[in-house]
């Protein structure tokens, strides 16, 4: 039986951080009580990120992939392609939330759930320069591409049907992969819901 959640986490040169973060992510997933898999996609690291993930994932449903070159978008693409879950989730190694997934399963008739930093009720506790950069990027996105989505980065949960339909259609890689995937989903008429989140990355917490 397919797991409820496939959590895809790209990592790059995170060997020192993974021993803290990956067990915390596993604990968050265990708190949900649903079957899950975590797919760590190490991409082009010069350290031992992949081995650190294997060591930190003992007795947990964690798969570790390694790619030759550093490419965040390709890491997401490959992780999504390998996923089996009903919901395919994009988390970062320093930014994840079981509460976000509880919101996902509480929704009905939806294909993409975005944890939007711009949604009313959200709290963005990141450094000011990062908050400004996010606002500028999303303003350009809405202006140039006429998107109604307020935030294409951060936590996202995609339905199995959406991933099976659109993952192979995305041509962008690096930091624009998920942006293109969200825009394609919007233009294809998939049902998108944005929910509030609290953004406080573990490194700065």
Please report, for each region that a protein language model flagged, where it lies by residue.
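Cell-envelope/extracellular polymer assembly enzymes that use nucleotide-activated donors
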Residues: 4-6, 37, 180
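Conserved sequence signature across two-component system core domains
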Residues: 7, 11-12, 41-43
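Short, well-formed alpha-helical segments that are part of the catalytic scaffolds
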Residues: 14-29
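Donor nucleotide-sugar binding loop of glycosyltransferases
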Residues: 14-17, 45, 72
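Acceptor/aglycone-binding surface of glycosyltransferases and processive sugar-polymer synthases
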Residues: 67-82, 87-90, 98-175, 201-205
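Catalytic donor-sugar/metal-binding loop of nucleotide-sugar-dependent glycosyltransferases
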Residues: 147, 170-173, 182-200
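Active-site acidic Asp-centered loop
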Residues: 43, 89-94
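A conserved acidic beta->alpha catalytic loop
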Residues: 42-51
